[in-house]
């Protein structure tokens, strides 16, 4: 059998194959089993290559993977940023190229380590997970599509997230890939490599321990007080959402759906999505009074997504916020989005990039919230994660440490239409529930609205672009 050095082009094909398998392991389509073998072709291609060659192969795999996972960015940039497709694709490839540097760096470091006697069986999972963690905060952080998130539907496996976060599962998946790679090398290489007996045994033991822990957690009964929530998915078309002419119709939709959801009696919590009201709730008295009257009528605490502002002398700070209204119609709290979307809600280093606002229409000028603030409902505190804050474990953990017993994710994924983005977004919020052992409810303008218990069960979820106003009760801690 010819060595893998014989046909360089084949090495790039194999690296690209790893990228394709990685992309397919995330929703949609979400063939999660592929994640456990997806990196084997890349590892085989790297073989005994020079570290610089391994870097290029890792970059190829990463570029293909992230291009397949994040294709939906073009939908938002072209449709709502009003950029030409050619410009959008350049921006998209720049992002995919940046993210591809992480698997490229992994391949490079692992090969250099092997040249110095450090086994890939140890180095590969450690370096992969270490770089996943760095990616979660470097350059504002973008922990999208970490390996472990591919398993969000495999509940016995993901229970370890309350101990290790998503990174524990990423480690297991990376270890599985490198063990399989070494087994194949042992069969196929000219110079027979030693079979990774110890590493394979460790992998099996870790998987058995993970599954045992998972099944144990899944069979523990929930104990606590009942809690009822009504989630409102208004399905407001993004193209008219901010048109003042549609404000009346938008408020009317949420009034109607909220009344139907609470027709059998008050809910402990009613949740409207991110920016459900397309105006400043603080000073649009005509509609604000209607919403206050509605909460009194429903006799339910209500979370309302709305932009907000704060004055500091002559300076005005704009915020992406969630207001909590009491059953008596009073605004009793506000939670401001802390982790903003770069180039969506603000321009990083705006002083050095003044041209960006001129190129891309619709970039916001929001300021980050100052602190984590749980909101008290009378039936327990809630922590509100606005939009893609749900992908950051430390934010969810901060709200739970601040006393929140339910996490609430309000979002508007209408930007991405019927792509895989809403499904990928949902998959990450499943981990926030398991990591903190609290239920998480999410209300999305056009979907996916969902109710997730503390073990990661998705108890209810919507389809995209449907009107929904479910009422659900469960036991929470």
Swiss-Prot record:
Q: What does this protein do?
A: Catalyzes the phospholipid dependent N-acylation of the N-terminal cysteine of apolipoprotein, the last step in lipoprotein maturation.
**One of the record's GO molecular function terms:** N-acyltransferase activity
Q: Which GO terms describe its biological process?
A: lipoprotein biosynthetic process
According to its record, how does it sit in the membrane?
Multi-pass membrane protein
Which lineage ranks, top first, belong to the organism behind this chain?
Bacteria, Pseudomonadati, Thermodesulfobacteriota, Desulfuromonadia, Geobacterales
* Residue span, CN hydrolase domain: 232-477
Pathway(s) this gene product operates in, as recorded in its UniProt entry: Protein modification; lipoprotein biosynthesis (N-acyl transfer)
Q: Where is this protein found? A: Cell inner membrane
What residue ranges are annotated as transmembrane? 20-40, 58-78, 89-109, 118-138, 155-175, 195-215
Give the species this sequence originates from: Geobacter sulfurreducens (strain ATCC 51573 / DSM 12127 / PCA)
Enzyme nomenclature, EC number: 2.3.1.269
Similarity field: Belongs to the CN hydrolase family. Apolipoprotein N-acyltransferase subfamily.
What's the protein here called? Apolipoprotein N-acyltransferase
UniProt KW Acyltransferase keyword: yes
**Keyword vocabulary terms for this entry:** Acyltransferase, Cell inner membrane, Cell membrane, Membrane, Transferase, Transmembrane, Transmembrane helix
Q: Which residues form the active site?
A: 274, 337, 387
Gene that codes for this? lnt
Q: Respond yes or no to whether keyword Cell inner membrane is given for this record.
A: yes
- Gene Ontology CC annotation, any one: plasma membrane
Q: Name one Pfam family in it.
A: CN_hydrolase
**InterPro entries according to UniProt:** Apolipo_AcylTrfase, C-N_Hydrolase, C-N_Hydrolase_sf, LNT_N
Which Gene3D superfamilies does its entry note? Carbon-nitrogen hydrolase
């Amino acid at each position: 059998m010819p060595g893998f050095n014989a046909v360089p082009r084949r090495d790039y094909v194999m690296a690209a194959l790893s990228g394709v398998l990685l992309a397919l392991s995330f929703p949609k389509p979400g063939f999660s089993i592929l994640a456990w073998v997806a990196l084997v072709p890349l590892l085989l291609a790297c073989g005994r290559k020079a570290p610089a060659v391994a870097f290029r192969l890792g970059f190829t795999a990463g570029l293909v993977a992230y291009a397949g996972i994040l294709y939906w960015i073009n939908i938002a940039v072209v449709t709502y940023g009003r950029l030409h497709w050619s410009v959008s694709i350049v921006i998209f490839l720049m992002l995919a190229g940046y993210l591809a540097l992480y698997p490229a760096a992994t391949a490079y470091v692992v090969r250099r380590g092997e040249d110095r006697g450090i086994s890939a069986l140890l180095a590969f999972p450690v370096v992969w997970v270490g770089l996943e963690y760095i990616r979660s905060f470097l350059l504002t952080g973008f922990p999208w599509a970490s390996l472990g998130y591919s398993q969000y539907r495999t509940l016995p496996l993901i229970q370890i997230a309350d101990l290790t976060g998503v990174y524990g599962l990423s480690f297991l998946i990376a270890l599985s890939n490198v063990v399989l790679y070494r087994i194949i090398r042992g069969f196929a290489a000219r110079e027979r490599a030693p079979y990774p007996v110890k590493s394979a045994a460790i992998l099996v033991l870790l998987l058995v321990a993970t599954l045992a822990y998972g099944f144990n957690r899944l069979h523990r009964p929930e104990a606590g007080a009942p809690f009822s929530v009504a989630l409102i998915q208004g399905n407001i078309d993004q193209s008219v959402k901010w048109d003042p002419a549609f404000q009346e119709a938008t408020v009317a939709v949420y009034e109607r759906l909220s009344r139907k959801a609470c027709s059998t009696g008050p809910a402990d919590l009613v949740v409207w999505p991110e920016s459900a009201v397309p105006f400043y709730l603080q000073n649009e008295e005509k509609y604000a009074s209607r919403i206050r009257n509605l909460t009194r009528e429903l006799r339910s605490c209500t979370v309302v997504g709305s932009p907000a502002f704060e004055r500091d002398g002559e300076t005005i700070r704009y915020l992406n916020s969630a207001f909590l209204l009491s059953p008596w119609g009073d605004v009793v709290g506000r939670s401001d989005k802390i982790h903003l979307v770069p180039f969506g809600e603000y321009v990083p280093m705006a002083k050095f990039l003044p041209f960006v606002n001129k190129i891309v229409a619709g970039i916001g000028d929001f300021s980050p919230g100052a602190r984590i603030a749980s909101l008290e409902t009378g039936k327990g505190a809630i922590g509100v994660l606005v939009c893609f804050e749900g992908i950051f474990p430390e934010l969810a953990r901060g709200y739970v440490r601040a006393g929140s017993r339910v996490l609430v994710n309000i979002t508007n994924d209408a930007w991405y239409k019927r792509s895989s983005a809403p499904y990928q977004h949902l998959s990450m919020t499943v981990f926030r529930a398991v990591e903190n052992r609290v239920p998480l409810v999410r209300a999305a303008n056009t979907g996916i609205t969902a109710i997730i218990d503390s073990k990661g069960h998705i108890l209810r979820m919507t389809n995209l672009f449907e009107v929904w106003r479910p009422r659900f009760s469960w036991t929470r801690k």
